[in-house]
Amino acid sequence: MGASTFSQSFAEKYEAWASVMLPALVGFAFLIYQAFFAIKYPANLPLAGEPDGKRTFSWRTRWRYYTDCEALYKETYENYTKRGKTVLLPGLGFRHDIILPQSSMRDIMAHPEKELSHADAVLELVQLKYSLGHEKYKADPWPCMLVKSDINSKLEAVCDGMNEELKYAFDKYIGCDTESWKEIDLLETIRMVIIAAASRFTVGFPLCRNEAYLRACWKVNDGIMMNGGLTGATPRLLRPIFGPLITMNLRRNIEKIKKQVEPVYCQRVQALSQQNSAEKPDSEEPKDLFQQMLRYAQKERPRELHDLPSMSRRLAFANFAAVHQTTILVTNMILNIVSSDSQYNTISVLRDEVNDIIGPDSNTKWTKYKVAQMIKSDSVARETMRLHSNTNRGVFRKVLVEGIKTEDGIELPKGAYVSFLGRPLQCNPETFEDPFKYDPFRFSRVREKAPRDAKATSNLSFVSTSPEHLPFGHGGHSCPGRFLVDFEVKMIVAYLLMNYDVEFPAEYNGQRPASRWMAEALMPPSGARIRIKRRS
């Protein structure tokens, strides 16, 4: 038998074996999981979409999670959480999620991390054990602390560099042609612009203009999302097998990031070693997140400082946090601005605001005060988050102890995951007029009517959170980078509208393509295009 014939025969036998054995293996793992590892939910916990007293979800209800999650969440809100009732929902793969009414939120957030853990809940959602190789990157998320404590206090200086990088990225990825219209894939183009701008913040110059580094970051972000979905949907017993397989390509791209970062890392670590760690940073020292990470590690995590793979993985996760949600938000904002322009004159209104507050010179310094005055741009961003938020639940916790009861008498079993619905409240007709219509100035109109009473309308700003508005979470674990995102999205929209004319292709008839649901995630329309031309 020839080698090629043998290989073909082996491949055919392997495929036949796999087609039988893999489903059997998954089924066997499911039975073992149900018998020995499944969480025992209390008998008085109702199941969404099922008759009273039912203890297991039907395939129909599970299928709805994947194909009609928006309606499933709306029914859950109307039938249970709106009425102050706790309920169980099917989730990704074999997961179940306990959904709590908003009236419980204050009590849930009052529990310490050792009882209701935010970090453990996020580890389950993102599956960092397999994407980054260790749970410490979320269990000990000290780079996030640096964003909250150090970077947010230096926003204006940080954003000077990001603004400069945005101009460079727009010119590179969109162009400067003032004569001809150009049609672009919006999501893919904005993703590269934001990766470049975010990299100016995370690693600084020159890596933020290194195409190989930026492409590797892009692929790592996609890999983290894919791993969270696929590994998270896998039965827990099989994750040690499938997790490493699913993340093979992701690990290769993290290695590419490490190789690109290594020269910068070595140079900076050497410079730090020549300084006394107690000294203040040199005035010429880089002012990016990576430098802050190295300085912190020098003082507080010396083992990690000299562990390039670990620092590279922390940087990769920081890039993911800085890019993923912002890309989705800005893509949706641009689609919404263009689609609402015919009714609300959105583009002209926003251009006037930029002219009045920032001025026509794109080199003008952006300040916290100026950003706070841009309430129309702020409203455009908040309305986009209200209607097109990628995440539709918030305030995730894992139950680590027995004995915690909800206000309606449900005991939360140890090991369960709890969260709160977001979208049904953000699209509630009792709160919002015409709730599924995009109204760019919905929030700015309210704020303009009460300009002297800033406190009364402060909860309507883009960065504000509440139990009824959860895109950034709420409470002590709400997104620490949202203040940077506030600067960034306003700078992007300002530069785009002041320097480019934008419109939809003729075949769109002035209407934005519909967003697409992927289970419970709401994604921008794939392949959505806009026509764009540089203004003279």
UniProtKB/Swiss-Prot annotation:
What keywords does the record list, in alphabetical order? Heme, Iron, Membrane, Metal-binding, Monooxygenase, Oxidoreductase, Transmembrane, Transmembrane helix
Tell me the function of this protein: Cytochrome P450 monooxygenase; part of the gene cluster that mediates the biosynthesis of the sesquiterpenoid aspterric acid (AA), an inhibitor of dihydroxy-acid dehydratase (DHAD) effective as an herbicide. PbrC catalyzes the third and last step within the pathway and converts the alpha-epoxy carboxylate intermediate produced by the cytochrome P450 monooxygenase pbrB from (-)daucane into the tricyclic aspterric acid.
> What single Pfam family name could you report for this chain, choosing any that match?
p450
InterPro entries given in the database record: Cyt_P450, Cyt_P450_CS, Cyt_P450_E_grp-IV, Cyt_P450_sf
Q: Which residues cross the membrane?
A: 20-39
User: Which residues take part in binding heme?
Assistant: C479
Can you tell me which family this protein belongs to? Belongs to the cytochrome P450 family.
Question: Its topology with respect to the membrane?
Answer: Single-pass membrane protein
Which EC class heads this enzyme's classification?
oxidoreductase
Q: What's a BP term from Gene Ontology annotated to this protein?
A: mycotoxin biosynthetic process
The protein's GO terms of the molecular function aspect are:
heme binding; iron ion binding; monooxygenase activity; oxidoreductase activity, acting on paired donors, with incorporation or reduction of molecular oxygen
In what pathway does it function? Secondary metabolite biosynthesis; terpenoid biosynthesis
Its protein name is Cytochrome P450 monooxygenase pbrC
Enzyme Commission code? 1.-.-.-
Q: Which organism is it from?
A: Penicillium brasilianum
Compartments in which it is found: Membrane
Query: Which cofactors are named for this entry?
Result: heme
Q: How is the protein put to use in biotechnology?
A: The fungal sesquiterpenoid aspterric acid (AA) is a submicromolar inhibitor of dihydroxy-acid dehydratase (DHAD) in plants and is effective as an herbicide in spray applications.
CC per GO annotation:
membrane
